[in-house]
Structures are given as C-alpha cells and as structure tokens.
C-alpha cells in the first residue's frame, strides 16, 4: 500500500511496518534563536490585562484576593452540572469496563457511541449549538469522574473539546463556522488538534507544514506531517496549523485551518502505542496536497500560533482534572488491596 492514496475519501490507516519515514515533505526548517524568539513573542497574548495569581506568586506577592473567595456557579448552571454528572456517573458505572480497554488497547465503539448520545462530547459547547453548556468547574468535575474510571477516555474527551475544533472555533471562529462545526462536535464528530511535527515541538518557528494558496484564491493546499495527534486516528475534524508562504495578497505565517479528515490526501500513517493510556487514539498524520477551502481558515493568516497557544492554555485547565481522577482511582485500588492482603497473620 502506498503511503498516500489521493483517491480515497476516508483516512488511510497504514500499518507501522509499512509507514514511510516521518520526514516533512517541505524539508526541515532551520531558524536561528532570534527568529524563534520573535515568533514566540509575536504569539503572546496582549489583550489580557487582569493580574495573574501565578505571576504574582512568582514575584513574591501572595495575592489571596485573586483566588478567594472562589466564584461559584449560579443556580441554573449548578443544577445543569449536577444533573449531567449524575447521568455520566451512571454511564461510567454500567457501560465502561476499564479492564477491557486496557486489554484491547482501544475504547469500544459502543462506549464512544454512548458518550456521544450522553452529550459528553459537547460538555463545553453552548446549548444553542446542541451542547451541554457546562461551566469550566463542572467540565473539570466530569473529566475527573471519567479519569477515575479510564484516563484514556478522559484524554479523548478533553482533546476533542479543550484543544480540538470546538475551542478555537468558540474563541476565534466566525458565526458561520460556529453554526457549521459546533453542532457536529457536540453530538456526532470527534476532533483532533494537529500542531506538533517530527522536528517541531516547543519551537514553532520551525513549523514545516505548508498551506499554499491556490491560483483561484478559493482554497489552500496543505502538505506536511503531524506527530502525537491525539484523537487523530479516529477524528472526523482536524484543527491543523500550517505555514502560509508570504506572497502578493497574502500576509503569510502560521495559520489555523479546520480540515475534514475524509479529505483526499490525508493519511493516518500509524497509531502510537503507550505504556499507559492504552486506549488513546494517538497517531502520525500526513497531509499531501490536501485542498482546504478558504472559509475553513480560522482567523487571519499569521494568527495561527496565537490561536494554537491560546487554545492550549485553555486545554491545560482540563488535564489536571483527568490526572486527579486517575490518582483518585489509584488510591482507591491501593486502599482496597491494603485491606484485603494478609501478611504476618494480619
């Protein structure tokens, strides 16, 4: 099987042994320290004017007033959150078998279907778009609950709506994009976030994936390889960061796009395996001449890195909840084992 089959309308999954080397078709991008620093600084959030508890603490000032008293949700938000947590708790108790996921290294299809029907993929999406509309507090509680049963499911849900299509569309999308994608993400579609590349991790200035405008100005052609694409193996929608070359009429720079995973030219080259999170659908995705309409661009050309970092900052609010849930589950197992084990006659 060839690595890329442009005639296919579904993502091609190539076994690891037949996957081509993970090398960007655009070639490795070399930048010096000054350019790397300039790109990172240009993406810094400049509109945020509120004081930061963490920053103040770093500077030696303990600003308790910034975190206490902690804001509480209103009665309607609390009722909505508690009702959803009750349904999610029952689903986790009756429908999720952690041992099966660990054994098979995948989340069963019926579990994913059930989570969609429950609304778990739309927890952070507003009700006007078909989502549950949870506050961040109740969203974290839900992820903690799921993480205490199976962390891979927590990562699936978190990657989908904390950094996948819903978050950047909510923050930077047009009204048309919100109407198009948020209802899909709330109920039917799984999304993934594609930023990291084989040679590009914390140094975005070296981003090699390109998005070349077509001559008619109606689309971009994307080429590149993305690594560590959580949900990328099963995703229906992708958020892809790619570099638009500067040219007449195009500012250029790192730009964000919503891409249909069924687009010709997309290849899932392999599914990565992990010691933990065995059910995680994380892979390597190659894009070869993938045509993306102009209306699928999020924001303006050159705003992609700021969109990506802002999205990731929001996503970092959810990961600790999944970790706390997993730690809670581990403590439960240790406690149960400590009371069941006999040693030295006790």
PLM regions: where:
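Extended, charge-enriched "interface" segments that sit outside catalytic cores
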Residues: 2-98, 105-106, 110
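Internal helix-loop-helix
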Residues: 117-188, 230-237
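Short beta-alpha junctions and helix-cap segments that line functional grooves
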Residues: 181, 196, 206-207, 225-227, ...
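A short, Trp-centered hydrophobic/proline-enriched beta-strand micro-motif
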Residues: 187-195
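Short Gly/Pro-enriched turn/cap motifs at secondary-structure boundaries
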Residues: 199-202, 228-231, 247-248, 274-281
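A structural signal for short hydrophobic beta-strand segments in well-ordered beta-sheet cores
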Residues: 209-212
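A short core secondary-structure module
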Residues: 218-219, 223-268
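Glycine-rich beta->alpha junctions and the first turn(s) of the following alpha-helix
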Residues: 267-346
């Amino acid at each position: 099987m060839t690595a890329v089959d442009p005639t296919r309308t579904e993502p091609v999954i190539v076994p690891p042994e037949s996957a081509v080397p993970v090398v960007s078709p655009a070639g490795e991008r070399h930048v010096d320290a000054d350019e790397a620093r300039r790109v990172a600084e240009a993406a810094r959030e400049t509109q945020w004017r509120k004081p930061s508890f963490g920053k103040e603490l770093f500077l030696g000032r303990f600003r308790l007033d910034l975190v206490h008293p902690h804001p509480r949700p209103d009665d309607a938000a609390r009722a909505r959150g508690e009702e959803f947590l009750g349904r999610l708790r029952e689903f986790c108790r009756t429908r999720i078998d952690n041992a099966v996921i660990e054994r098979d290294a995948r989340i069963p299809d019926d579990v994913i279907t059930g989570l969609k029907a429950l609304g778990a993929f739309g927890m952070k999406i507003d009700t006007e778009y078909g989502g549950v509309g949870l506050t961040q507090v109740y969203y974290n509680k839900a992820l903690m609950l799921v993480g205490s049963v199976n962390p891979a499911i927590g990562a699936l849900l978190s990657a989908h709506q904390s950094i996948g299509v819903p978050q950047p569309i909510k923050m930077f999308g047009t009204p048309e994009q919100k109407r198009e994608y948020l209802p899909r993400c709330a109920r039917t579609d799984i999304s993934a976030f594609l930023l990291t590349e084989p040679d590009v991790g914390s140094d975005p200035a070296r981003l090699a994936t390109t998005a070349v405008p077509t001559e008619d100005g109606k689309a971009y052609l994307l080429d590149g390889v993305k690594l560590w694409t959580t949900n990328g193996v099963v995703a229906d929608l992708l958020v892809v960061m790619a570099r638009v070359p500067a040219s007449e009429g195009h500012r250029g720079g790192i730009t964000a796009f919503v891409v249909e995973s069924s687009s010709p030219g997309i290849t899932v080259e392999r599914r990565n395996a992990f010691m933990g999170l065995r059910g995680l659908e994380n892979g390597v995705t190659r894009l070869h001449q993938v045509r993306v309409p102009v209306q699928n661009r999020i924001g303006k050309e050159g705003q992609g890195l700021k969109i990506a970092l802002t999205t990731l900052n929001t996503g970092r609010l959810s990961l600790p909840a999944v970790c706390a849930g997993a730690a809670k589950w581990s403590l439960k197992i240790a406690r149960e084992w400590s009371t069941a084990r006999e040693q030295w006659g006790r």
